[in-house]
């Protein structure tokens, strides 16, 4: 989950991102992590499926210019990884998450056409100051988001957005 203050570009509250992330503790008991860059905050709770020791998130490329939070599984990551290694990319883990980073570095948004799996992720490109939020083609993994007062809030479930106070909890009378 995370938050981006795209309008005023003021720093994102660390307490806010921690509160958002804590709402997903039930989904990821194995690890948690955070990344902050100016007006961006990313938080992650991890359930270890692939690379039990090396998949800490948010995960960065070797230059720490790309950061990703990822939920799901990339089924064809060994094939995509082999292709990227053939193109000169060096991997530090055995995690499928890292394939997203180097795939984006190589192909940009075209990496989405190469990924087969069930996933949702948010990737922050520090140099371009761009956030790519994506999910699998079938929509197996969800991405929830809200934009309120110049801040984008997102998560793999609604709880982080509610914890951020970005949505009211009133019933729609219609």
Language-model segments: residues:
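Cysteine-centered catalytic environments shared across enzyme families
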Residues: 1-174
